[in-house]
């Protein structure tokens, strides 16, 4: 029996009809405010799990498990699964769904009802994030997980294609921006797969992609991450402005910004979209004028 067949034998996957029936019985309709789009193709979810290269020692974190489509695929593959769900009804329904469809591994699931953007602790230390992320919180959710949970060594996330391109973009490309640079503080992202809009219910208006991010050590030991991120935010608050003007508020004045830009070995006429993470680190470390 194949790995997929074995998993399906012990954890019955959710198809489109199953998810619609669960939604009907729970009185749930997909909520745009939570960016809810449920995957109805188990094959896509198995691919996501393979991209994560899970082991029996992993403690997985899933954000927005919904009715449990991905949860059912992950449970047989990991030691423990921490599922963070903001929707109160879905958080209450999920454990029973897992008990009925995956009884052999139901005790591996821990459901946390809450907002991932406000999470400070979890019942265990996650080693990997695997999730079909709600479209409206994908970028801040990934950054939050890397910031708060240093034990996470890798993530595999499904996000809309535009977000995936922003996360993986290089300097000078149209998709390059604050998310691209901030993510590089934690690791390197790459697109590992494409996903059709047809595998979701309700069907979104955009295509999706799967992104893998592997954590790397901080680029420069001892550098204040918050200080670097503050410069990045200032540079991209007005994306098309030259650094001298874009950083004037951050530095205190346009003249002060120019002096710090020059001290960092950059040009006042440069724009943030052309700078690397190393450039922003030098800017943050450049001494302020007296």
Curated annotation (Swiss-Prot):
According to UniProt, the reaction catalysed is: adenosine(1518)/adenosine(1519) in 16S rRNA + 4 S-adenosyl-L-methionine = N(6)-dimethyladenosine(1518)/N(6)-dimethyladenosine(1519) in 16S rRNA + 4 S-adenosyl-L-homocysteine + 4 H(+)
Keywords per UniProt: Cytoplasm, Methyltransferase, RNA-binding, rRNA processing, S-adenosyl-L-methionine, Transferase
GO MF terms here are: 16S rRNA (adenine(1518)-N(6)/adenine(1519)-N(6))-dimethyltransferase activity; RNA binding
Q: What is its EC number?
A: 2.1.1.182
Compartment annotation = Cytoplasm
One Gene Ontology cellular component term attached to this UniProt record is: cytosol
**Where does this protein hold S-adenosyl-L-methionine?**
37, 39, 64, 85, 115, 132
List, alphabetically, the Gene3D superfamilies matched: Ribosomal RNA adenine dimethylase-like, domain 2 (1.10.8.100), Vaccinia Virus protein VP39 (3.40.50.150)
Recorded hits in NCBIfam families, A to Z, give: ksgA
The entry's family comment says: Belongs to the class I-like SAM-binding methyltransferase superfamily. rRNA adenine N(6)-methyltransferase family. RsmA subfamily.
The record's function comment reads:
Specifically dimethylates two adjacent adenosines (A1518 and A1519) in the loop of a conserved hairpin near the 3'-end of 16S rRNA in the 30S particle. May play a critical role in biogenesis of 30S subunits.
The name of this protein is Ribosomal RNA small subunit methyltransferase A
**Native organism:** Acidothermus cellulolyticus (strain ATCC 43068 / DSM 8971 / 11B)
Q: What is the lineage of its organism?
A: Bacteria, Bacillati, Actinomycetota, Actinomycetes, Acidothermales
């Amino acid at each position: 029996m194949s790995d997929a067949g074995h998993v399906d034998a012990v954890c019955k996957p959710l198809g489109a009809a199953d998810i619609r029936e669960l939604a009907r019985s729970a009185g749930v309709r997909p909520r745009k405010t939570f960016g809810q789009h449920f995957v109805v193709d188990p094959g896509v979810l198995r691919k996501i799990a393979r991209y994560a290269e899970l082991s029996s020692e992993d403690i997985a974190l899933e954000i927005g498990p919904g009715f449990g489509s991905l949860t059912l695929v992950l449970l047989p593959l990991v030691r423990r699964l921490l599922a963070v769900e903001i929707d109160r009804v879905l958080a209450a329904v999920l454990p029973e769904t897992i008990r009925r469809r995956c009884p052999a591994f139901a005790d591996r699931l821990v459901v946390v009802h809450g907002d991932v953007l406000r999470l400070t602790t979890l019942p265990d230390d996650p080693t990997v994030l695997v999730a079909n992320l709600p479209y409206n919180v994908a970028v801040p959710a990934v950054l939050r997980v890397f910031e708060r949970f240093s034990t996470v060594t890798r993530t595999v996330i499904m996000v809309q294609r535009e977000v995936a391109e922003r996360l993986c973009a290089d300097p000078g490309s149209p998709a390059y921006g604050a998310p691209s640079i901030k993510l590089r503080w934690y690791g390197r992202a790459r697109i590992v797969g494409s996903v059709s809009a047809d595998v979701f219910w309700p069907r979104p208006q955009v295509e999706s992609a799967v992104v893998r991010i592997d954590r790397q050590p901080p680029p420069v030991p001892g550098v204040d991450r918050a200080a670097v991120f503050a410069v990045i935010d200032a540079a991209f608050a007005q994306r098309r402005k030259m650094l001298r003007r874009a950083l004037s508020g951050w530095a205190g004045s346009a003249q002060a910004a120019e002096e710090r830009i020059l001290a960092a070995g950059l040009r006042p006429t440069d724009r943030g979209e052309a700078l690397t993470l190393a450039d922003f680190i030098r800017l943050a470390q450049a001494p302020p004028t007296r």
